[in-house]
Amino acid sequence: MRRGKDRWYRAYPGWIRWVLIGWFALAILAPFVANERGLVIRYREEIHFPVFHQWGVDAGIIPHQDYLRFRLHEHPQDYQILIGPLIPYRAETLDASNSNYRSPLGHQEISSWYYRHWLGTDQLGRDTLAGLVYGARTAWWVGMLATALSIIVGLFFGLISGYYGNDRAFISRGSVLAGCVVLLVVLSEDIGWSHQSTQTLEVLLKWGLLVGLFLLLLFGFHRVPSLKKRIGVPIDRMFLAVIGWFKSLPGLVVVMALLPLFKHTGIWSLALLIGLFRWPLIGQYVRAEMLRIRHLPFMESVRLLGLSDRRILIKHALPNVWPPVIVNAAFGVGAAVAVESALSFLGLGLGLDQVTWGTLMNAGRNYFPAWWLTVFPGIALFIVVYVCNVLGDRWLAQYNS
């Protein structure tokens, strides 16, 4: 086991490790790297931590304090900066003195070199370097969340499809009938289930009633002898049909069409949509591996021991189908980051208040002389996608060997 872990670890060349560590650090520490507030300040003879305090205010844990309204370049005399961030701007900070596309090589209106915009500004005076930092955080979370979602869904359906196939899954007629009745109730227009509820309690109550209705019907139908009879469920055939349906859809176009359905497009909703169209690929590989190992001697042995299907899948099948999942996860992160940047570049990604690599490149597209708005985010995007693909290739080579 130790030798196997070392072999996978050697797939990380030194430069790939440093890029991934740096990307992760920016994703976690972005407010400490680029911020318009000091990390540690002295205000009215008291020590404060504005960045930490702002987190508490945003979370509703602690009340707002007077010193949070001051910025690094605009503060009274009794406001002393003890420790400041590396970049004295947030991604959305407006510097009116350096608006209208200030070049990183040109003249800038600054009081000291600390406040210089090292990678230039956009039309509103927002710092490009700060935008790269916060864009790295957005790319990290979208890539990781979308990939995690696709892995969870793909693993579940791939394992179930490969293990049960078309001849091992059975369900009673009563369960099928109860499920159909509940589905008709959900789709019914007469009782208003199709309208979105704004009250969380009302939503929970409706779903609770649905579950109760299903259980009640299930109990009643199972008292009828003819409905107790079990019928086979061709799970593998159904899974392949779903996979074929997903493959026939242009994923990026469908994501673009579904985004307007969300009232506010955030990281979670965007990752959900991207992961929705990534899981079939992982599910295919998991199904193929499961079909390969399900008739091997060790799988037949654990079945003869009387272990439950859940324990067989989790303890014995999952470790054997995991390697191809890891390989596809590396490619999936790069693909998710590329899709997020493409959507933001087209103005269809996150909200207008979110700065991403795609929105920076979109701003550069509107004014061609501002080359820094396309070059630097493009380089960052290329490095991340390239690293993910190289890592996936190396893991694939290790897996095949």
Q: Could you describe each region identified by the protein language model?
A:
Residues 159-163, 260-261, 288, 292, ...:
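Transmembrane helix-loop junction
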Residues 21, 132, 144, 148, ...:
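Residue-level signature of the transmembrane alpha-helical core
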Residues 252-284, 325-359:
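Non-cytoplasmic
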Residues 235, 247-254:
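A hydrophobic, multi-pass inner-membrane permease signature
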Residues 137-153, 254, 291, 310-342, ...:
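Transmembrane alpha-helices
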Residues 1-155, 159-230, 234, 314, ...:
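Gly/Trp-centered helix-boundary motif
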